[in-house]
Amino acid sequence: SINLKAKSEQLGFRYYSDGKTRGYGENNNKNFNLLNLTKSDIFIVCNPDISIDIDSFEHLLNSVEKSNADIYGVKVFESDDFKTWSSHNRSFPSLFDPLISLIFKKKLFENHVDSYAYPDWIGGAFMIFKSESYSKLKGFDEDFFMYYEDTDICYRAKKLGMTTIYDPKFYIIHEARRAGRKMFSKSFFMNFKSMLTYFRKHPTFKLISI
């Protein structure tokens, strides 16, 4: 919008829009290519509905730069009451995990730990990449319009020997929409389609994650 563009320019941010509708991964790939980052830069992928304390953010960036992480994630609170949180310390899903999650409202592939960890993957609401690593991965797979692009890129990163870190010293607040958890909603079918795409690319013989 015109107002958002003006506000972005006022704050010193670069605003880009060409009016095209793209998936989450494709939009981030487009942004990455527009920025012409150096190998030592970092690239942050985040949803528009997240918030983070500015002082904490500066410390987070310092931690990322000092780490050996190719992909870096933090603790995620679902609201500013700080009651419900996701550790983003996750194992790669098995074939039946997503279906069990929908039925029992439980994420089997998410381990709630409050300590520094090396998870299989972290959620796409907030991911920090070393620029060089994102480039080597060729960004997100644009076959995913929304959902599972985060799991996929972390899977490919692990196959290349890259390091994913979860650091709970830092956190964001993500006012996540829950439409995707409702059976037969538009988001449900989008999630299901992405799930099929993921398991076609990365078939697993585990029935559930452990």
Describe each PLM feature range.
Residues D120-G139, D143-Y171:
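A short, conserved alpha-helix in the catalytic core of glycosyltransferases
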Residues Y155, K159-I210:
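Active-site-adjacent helix/loop segment of glycosyltransferases
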Residues S1-K20, T38:
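Acidic donor-binding segment of Leloir-type glycosyltransferases
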Residues K39-S51:
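Short beta-strand-to-loop acidic/aromatic patch adjacent to the donor-nucleotide binding site
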Residues F92-P119:
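Short, flexible, basic/aromatic active-site loop/helix in glycosyltransferases
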Residues D18-T38:
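Glycine-rich, basic loop-to-helix element that forms the pyrophosphate-binding segment
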Residues I54-S87:
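Conserved donor NDP-sugar-binding/catalytic core segment of glycosyltransferases
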Residues N27-N28, D55-H59, D150:
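Acidic donor-diphosphate engagement hotspot in glycosyltransferases and nucleotidyltransferases
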